[in-house]
Amino acid sequence: MKSAFNKLRPNFWSRLTPSSDGDYFFVELEDAHRTWHPGDTVHGNVILVLYKPQRISSVDLSFAGNVVVKSALVKGKGSRSVLFEQKLRLHGTPTAGSNSNTTPSSGNHNSHVSNSATNSNRNSGSHMSTRTSNRNSNSHVASNTPSMSTSPTSTSSGVAATADTTTTMDTNTSQASSTAPDTLNPSSSTELSRTATRQSSDGSIWRSVGSSTPGAASGGVADMMMNSVTTEPVLSSRMSMHTTNSHLSQMSRESHVTTASRESHMSRESNTSTSSTSEELEIGEHRFAFILEIPQKGLFNSLEFERGSISYVITAVAKRHGPLPALHAKRVLQLVCPVDVARLPPPKPSTLSVEIQKRKKQQGIITTTLEVGRGGYLRGESFPVKITIQHVKCVKCLRGLVVTLCRFSKVTCNDDEPQSFRKDLSQTVSPLYTDPVTFSSTVSTTLRIPPDVFPTTKGHGLVSFNYCVEVVIDLAGKWDLEEDRTGFLHTDRLKRNKGVVSLWTEVIIGTDRRRYRSDSHATAHTNTNHVTNHVSQNHGSPGHVNFGHVPSPSGSSNHGNGHGAYGVGHASQSSSPGNHSNYSYHGNPNHGASHINNHVTAGSSHTSGGLSEKQLMKLREEALLPSEPAAISSPSLDAFPSAPEYAIGDEVAGSSAGPSAPSAPAHTIAGVVASAPLTPSDKHENELLRLQGLSSDPYADEDHVPQYKEKEKAPEEVVAMQLNELASVPPIEGEIEEVGNSANAPSAPVMNGHEGGFFDAPSEFSESSAPPVVHGHVHGHVHGHSHSSTGTIVSGDASASAPAPTSIRSVSTAPSDTPTAPPVITHGFTGPVGPGVVDPGTSGTASTTVDSLNSEISSGTPASTLPDTNKSLSDSDDIYS
């Protein structure tokens, strides 16, 4: 039955779900997932959702920071200390103590409380007239254009009253009786209220216009007014409440106000404390905006420990009329006080000395030192701990050192005695073995800070949280320890044993580590500019070495002037700081190293002389230059796009290269590489060159391996392949006899005229589109390693052999009556196959070559003068290089 009645409730637009009692009350922040810091400003709203009309007397808001310590004896009891507290009234009549700000560490923040009543009495008339005129103008605009339902907020006497109008019933004015009643369509009012509610959810403050019914024409108009709260700049409050729906019966009941009640209320206008204490709010979602400012001093990090907590809570209370209980809502703020550990000085070593005074045993002093690397660390980091012991005897203990990271908490509340607590966070156990000769021992261990601990908090009398590293040492070496069930050893019990000492040092755990530009970095940057400019001015001329030589990666190195110099041109060094990649080499390689060494030696010799401090600093800056050229340097990417390829041994002398990429002689490269040292003495410069080399060539850091060309096939294999090609040609009549007669006649290949060059197949066959037919007999076949599928088939008769290939020229073809010879297949060549050379100035083609052969054959040249194809192929060493 109850669920059936719930369906009959009026529906209105709301993003919220009702609670068990039918109402919903909570605090909403504009930035809900933010971590707050001292001095920040908090913006938010107190939202009240009503599913039936109720009388709400007041809505109060308080913001307080508390330190709570639980009782160790009685469960559920404890003490509470207030760091600061702020109170303000969001809805209802302000009282003498409704708006206050109590901060122990700040000045007077509640001066406006005593003057709130005076300001209200002095400005009540102006507030009333302004609101009446605004209400009338807004009602007129709303009746004509329902879409415009907002108006600017009202001010009085220069005091900003940042608040919104509400749908409450107030009878503070007498001019409303003479004002014509305004009417609004209920549907239009609903749309306007929904729009206002949606816009208010974005954080903006809107002013809704109330609606009245036609039944209220004779009785008057319900006032849409609010009670302003005078605030100060430090703690300001805004009050905003929107109604999302209105019903005809509700509005008619609220707008029915008699003239007598208005006149009686006007008589009590001068005393605001006697105004109505409860106002009926309609069905809908009501929003009360507020602004709070967090104090800048006297605060601690939000945390919870075993015996208490430090919290910052925003509490809202809505008091309802009658016996109904008040509504409470809380919102906890996570406050973090920044602690920067970047500039904390390193802690001093903690030293403990124990003097041994016994008659029977050896006397002396045992010294123990505890060192921690830095003064502060962040949560989740690990830090080293070093313990140094100088003993008087040899000690061997398997578990002689216990290093513990612990937290000490000290809390004082309500003028009670301070309460101290300790909690172990991390612990390591290490063996203790002293040297039998020196009786000394150095132990290094590592402790890890848990990520869930809170930062160091101190500087206030109420609470303090410090972190310490405690070391317990068994100097006697008689421990027999067993681990506790929780994994931590109770050091308090160990300290009671004989021959046990302990020492500790403080460690600060911060919230962040900011990067600062130190003065040393700026000085180093200035020195780098000075050194670079000095090198550009003094060592930029030819004949000097600028930080080593640069081999040409692309193999386009230039031969020198006949003295074996190896360089890459006159590339000047850049003077920009940090750019050491554009180095150049000119002249003798050994001259640069000796020049720099002499320069540094001279600078060192001047140091002993009576020079000024400025001159000494200049010499020291010059000493930062590398003492010899680097063995491996990385040029710029624009000048040298790839890595060099060197040849070793006979390959350098025997390899053939084109005219566009000549290589340096082997003795020149060997001399340059040998003259460069393996490891420069300047470590910083060597590391800089190595990193820059890796940026351009990832393999520059590895040992150089000479790049060899792919090994070609042996001449015998090539001859076999060519014979297979000839075997595929169909046999011709008389082929056997002709082959037998010309077996010993060598043939010469056609070259392109360059020693060690290549045969240009397209240019040779450019003038003949079809294979010409020549009558004659050719003794032998002309073969070559083909790189093109294009070939020329020549058939003809010949009675004589061809002359030597060096005398091949373009002559006319002479016909002959000899039998037809087998076809000769001439393929394009990729390399020299014989001593024959074709003049590059002669534009010879395939047909011209065959005509020359036939002409020489017809002239009666002996067959023995033709070169042997097989012999020339086998005797040539650099054919396939």
Swiss-Prot record:
Pfam entry (one): Arrestin_C
GO cellular component terms given for this protein: mediator complex; transcription regulator complex
Stretches with biased composition (Polar residues): 117-128, 178-215, 242-261, 571-587, 595-610, 846-873
Biased composition (Low complexity): 93-116, 129-177, 269-278, 523-535, 551-560, 787-796, 810-819, 828-845
The protein's name: pH-response regulator protein palF/RIM8
Similarity field: Belongs to the arrestin family. PalF/RIM8 subfamily.
Superkingdom to which the source organism belongs: Eukaryota
Any one Gene Ontology BP term: positive regulation of transcription by RNA polymerase II
Organism: Yarrowia lipolytica (strain CLIB 122 / E 150) (Yeast)
Task performed by this protein: Required for the proteolytic cleavage of the transcription factor RIM101 in response to alkaline ambient pH.
Stretch list, region Disordered: 90-223, 242-280, 515-612, 779-881
